Amino acid sequence: MNAYDYYGEARALAEALKNAGFPAYGSEISGAMDEGETGTEIFMMMRARLANLLADGKLPPDLIARLRALHGRLNDALT
């Protein structure tokens, strides 16, 4: 069983992004949890949005590392 707290990390990451001056980026992540109907849909939306945020290149290294980690875990869960 996978005990990783995807939603908890996503919420914490969204808050960290907002606190670091990237409120729109944080809203992208939290929005996926609000907009998705099923767990799979939420995971797919978060994975896509995280990929877009990673491609942006404006974030500090610590947040990039957290985005990559969550993106990787979501990718593993969906494949």
Question: Which residues does each PLM region occupy?
Answer:
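C-terminal-biased regions
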Residues: 1-79
